[in-house]
A protein has these predicted regions:
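Extracytoplasmic/periplasmic solute-binding protein
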Residues: 139-148, 152, 179-235, 241, ...
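Hinge/lid segment of periplasmic solute-binding proteins
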Residues: 22-34, 100-153, 188, 216, ...
Length: 468
């Protein structure tokens, strides 16, 4: 178990070094300098844009290339805006900041510029933990530069786990020590043990609402060796792995907040930070909030670690939800696409990323690079235990449904899982309905096209079965 140790705030420590290291910054500047002054436009949420400003301004000073205008909309709504731009083949926006799961759809629409040639010329490579750097690739090409390393981390209340009375009661009841959960049944047993609404403690802080809950379901499915489709694009959710995943998904209701079917992150996060939750899997950025004593009542009261595992072929299998991987993509219809590509590379450098990641006010960017895992500033923002947990989970990060039509497939999951969770569909009907609805989407988009997409989807799954 890794402890979430409360640490002092950064105070006056400078987060940005004015000159980037020669091996990653100078080559990008050299590649971009000949382009000249360029004003770029982006579709991006301001919550992400604000902490990006200092490195953006540094690049603009060095090259004359800057992002001078953004269309400010939230990241969950950007896919619709991006597809609208793609359908009109508009060159208005140069960069879009969105979840990498949209890459297959946007490539299929002819909207995205491959970035490998720009990266090679700029001597730039994403130095990601594990296989995380594969998640913005498609058909062997790189289409996105990571800026936000979203990954699920297991959180459990340290004070509850280390309480002597709790330890004795748990061992007396279950005949085993109160310990870090190795699998989903271990975690559910732990959540039920701590669940006590009368005292203001709910066992689970996991989300089950539309737009969020499906992420947990996919993680459970992957952890039992499941996959939404076979290579011929036949839906395969209604399988033993799917049944295991659905059981875990639905039983959470026993230890959840009564309003959880309608809660998103903005509703759940305050309850977690206030100490009203015993355990959950959540995006790593929450650690920065929980460990900030100025914003959290529970700083120093959390343990962070690897999410529980499932089982496939008789062996344990760990899969952590790496969704959405938020990336910068470049509009291939833009006359400024080269300038946009080099700006994206610059913002993906270690020095730019570490500044965004260690921002204690704007906490949307999360650590994802190898050097960040040993950077003292990152440890100060997340706690040493938090960083170790992020690294472990990044090593087994699994993607969203990485196919053309992602939003349609996600809508199918949202609808059926939601109806199952509130009792409008019987559990036995949920998986059958998902497979039937998936088959309709496959037919509408085209089986031949999706069979090609499937190859990339399967290829970007993590190779490790557990963290190193």
């Amino acid at each position: 178990m890794q402890g979430g140790l409360g640490l002092a705030t950064l105070g006056g420590t400078p987060l940005w070094r004015s000159a980037l290291a020669a091996d990653e910054g100078d080559a990008i500047v050299a590649a971009a300098k000949g382009i000249g002054k360029t004003d770029l436009k982006a579709i991006m949420w301001s919550n992400y844009f604000v902490p990006m400003k200092p490195p953006m301004e540094e690049f603009q000073k060095a090259t004359g290339i800057g992002i001078t205008s953004i269309k400010d909309i939230s990241t969950p709504t950007i896919p619709q805006a991006a597809m609208a731009e793609a359908l009109t083949r508009s060159g208005d926006f140069d960069l879009i900041h969105l979840g990498s799961e949209m890459i297959p759809s946007l490539v299929s629409a002819g909207y995205l510029e491959p970035l490998d040639e720009y990266m090679q010329k700029a001597n730039y490579a994403m130095n990601a933990v594990g296989d995380y750097g594969k998640l913005p690739t498609y058909d062997g090409k790189t289409y996105g530069i990571i800026t936000d390393g979203n990954i699920f981390v297991q959180q459990i209340r340290k004070d509850l786990m280390e309480d002597g009375d709790n330890k004795k009661k748990f061992e007396d009841k279950f005949g085993k020590p109160l310990a870090w959960p190795q699998n989903w049944d271990d975690e559910f047993r732990l959540m039920k043990f701590f669940h006590n609404p009368d005292k203001g403690i709910f066992g689970s802080g996991n989300l089950r609402s539309r737009g969020f809950g499906y992420v947990w379901f996919l993680m459970y499915l992957y952890s039992y060796g499941g996959f939404p489709f076979d290579p011929d694009m036949k839906p395969t959710v209604n399988t033993d792995a799917g049944k295991q995943a659905l059981d875990i998904y639905l039983r959470d209701k026993e230890v959840a907040f009564p309003d959880s079917p309608s809660w998103g992150t903005s509703q759940m996060i305050p309850h977690i930070a206030a100490g009203e939750v015993a355990a959950c899997q959540y995006w790593g950025g929450l650690i920065k909030l929980c460990e900030n004593p100025e914003k959290s009542k529970t700083a120093g009261k959390w343990l962070y670690g690897l999410v529980p595992g499932g089982e496939a072929n008789g062996k344990p299998l760990w899969r952590a939800a790496g969704m959405p991987v938020v990336v910068l993509v470049v509009n291939r219809n833009s006359p400024r696409k080269a300038a946009a590509a080099y700006m994206a590379c610059w913002l993906g450098t270690e020095k730019a990323s570490s500044q965004m990641v260690t921002d204690r006010v704007n906490t949307f960017h999360d650590a994802w690079t190898r050097p960040e895992m040993t950077d003292p500033r990152v440890a100060q923002a997340y706690s040493p235990g938090g960083v170790k947990a992020i690294k472990a989970n990044l090593e087994v990060a699994c993607p969203n449904i990485y196919l053309t039509g992602n939003q349609e497939f996600v809508d199918v999951l949202d609808k059926n899982l939601g109806q199952g969770y509130v009792g409008q569909l019987k559990a036995a009907e949920v998986l059958k309905s998902i497979d039937e609805d998936f088959a309709k989407v496959v037919k509408r988009i085209g089986t031949a096209k999706l069979k090609q997409d499937y190859k990339t989807y399967a290829a970007i799954m993590p190779t490790a079965t557990k963290p190193a």
